[in-house]
Amino acid sequence: MVKTVYVTGYKSFELNIFKDDAPEVHYLKQFIKHKIEQLLDEGLEWVLIQGQMGIELWTAEVVIELQRTYDSLKFAVITPFQGHTEKWNEHNQSKYANIIKHADYVDSIFHTSYQGPFQFKQADQFMLEHSDQTLLIYDEEQEASPKFFKQMLVDFMDKTNYTCDIVTFDELTAFINDLQWSEDQSF
């Protein structure tokens, strides 16, 4: 049974998404919602993110929406270090602040500012050790920052009984096609 899931994947700019109202955001959020609802049916209690723009913040927005129906669902934002949003623009900082306001738990792995890439690696390791499953939205055909986490995830799974759901673009495309078809049928 999966009680705690870590959701991660591409940053928004890695998907060439630069606006919250881009159609891709709608479909990605619907996909994330679908995946989380499946886990909720199996006993999911917590969703963990590190607070990165893109898949992680969209996941937080989905969880906030789902909490209206599933009041036992909780989410945590556990950042690698403090002040990780300082270089973000005002809009993204405001969006992040709103998400933090709704989070059930907020902390940082390192209670310092950025000191080096080791902080990201330690945060990734923490997430693996404190969750039952990872939902990773990543396709090897479009390499980007999640490739480092994916390698750590594969190594971790080899040593433990940890499970993951690695979502490829093919799975996303199939879901989006089905969703678009059902939306077209409802008119």
Swiss-Prot record:
InterPro entries given in the database record: YspA
Top-level taxon in the UniProt lineage: Bacteria
Signal sequence bounds: none
PANTHER family tied to this protein: UPF0398 PROTEIN SPR0331 (PTHR38440:SF1), UPF0398 PROTEIN YPSA (PTHR38440)
Family membership: Belongs to the UPF0398 family.
Protein known as: UPF0398 protein SAOUHSC_01463
Lineage: Bacteria, Bacillati, Bacillota, Bacilli, Bacillales
